[in-house]
Amino acid sequence: MKQFKLRQLLPVLAFSFFISCQSSDKEKTSKETIPAKTDPLAKASRENKNGWVYVHLEGSPSDIGYQHGYLLSNEIDTTIQALSYYLEHETKKDWAFYRQCARNFLWDKLDREYKDEINGIAAGLHAKQKNYDSLDITALNAMEELAFYYVPQLMDKEKAGSGDNKAPGNCSAFIATGSYTKDGKIVIGHNNWTEYIIGQHWNVIADVVPEKGNHMLMDCMPGFIHSGDDFVITSNGILITETTITGFKGFDTTGIPEFQRARKSAQYSNSIDDVIRIFNTGNNGGYANDWLIGDTKTNEVAKLELGLKDYRVWRSKDTAMIGSNFPSDPKLIADETTFKVNDKSSSPNARKMRMEKLVTNLKGKLDVETGEQIEADHYDAYHNVKINNKCVICGHIDEDKNGCAEWDLPAYYPMGAVQGKVTTADLAKDMKFWAHMGHPCGQDFIGAPFYKLHPQYAWQAKYLVEMKSYPWTLFEAKK
């Protein structure tokens, strides 16, 4: 009996010890300890379902972090291994470089709340014998803004133009309301475009109940304190998603990391205005996006196009707004991107044509079912053909002989749509959304035959074996 009680206390003791000891070069990264009899896992849970890992995280920032690190320890470990391997190959920067960035200009910009949560994740990992610290978790959360915004800036300093087309082409999305939807209320959908070696890990559904702010339900990668791709609904009726801005260039190391602004906008926004304000406060230009935002309380939707120097907002209670990695504001395009507005053969512009036609044709019919159809669509509006390539909403660059030059991806690069989500105002009020892991069209990616056909990508086989497609699944936050 004494041995059993000791085993029960081990996670608690490990958590208390780690949180009290964890530190960075400049400060103690957490001074919080918890009472010896408190179980940080008491309110947490985990469930595997149709390719997703659902986790319920609840409590103080330290508790939420510990629950996250403990319950997803293996997934975080595997993700960091794959990510560090991928980044070293593609950006020519090793994991030590990204940790150094976290130390030099990210950690000190974080709010105490998020430092405590990150320290908690590291504590949970240590309790499961995974040797990562707060710098690893910070670098993981900032992977997009560091690898594809900061590193290209360094490249340009060495050779002008060498950092062009490095901003990723992540995602297709829409948000609609009013006469465009079946019930006149908001419908929102998003599919995630990512390199498969990374995108296969974007398979967490995080149900987060913090001590302060909104209850959040979102998809994310293991170890993320934000959604990252992004798709999040909140208990206050705020819905947020995005697509990246192709050809964007700009990064300010003195600003607040994008991953904190994204998390904070979901956790503390009560209105569309709040989301816009939080994203603009301390903006570092990292992971520059067109943010699609909805408020179920007012039935209004908005698009926030946010660069580093420029931003613009569009709002309406009767519209369908789309995103496929194209910027819209002429000033932002001219000032901060290399985007080719008139190149209709590019992935962003071809998908824009298709999505505009779909939301017009489906006016008055948009709901979960039609949203799922949009995310799985395979019609190339530029070539007027049904096909698997870079120009379709459910992207398959791994089958495109031309690759995707606008994102600096060569022919047949294993990248495309890796998962999807959709919800309605009524579902969101109950903290529910539908999610699909793997290509929304239902097609599997199997590594062995792919590497045989395209041996230039066999280096990825170490961490990318397959990416299976699963059924659409309804997820619901715990009440």
Each language-model region and where it sits:
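N-terminal mature-domain region immediately after signal-peptide cleavage
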Residues: 22-273, 280-285, 292-315, 344-479
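Bacterial Sec-dependent N-terminal signal peptides
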Residues: 1-33
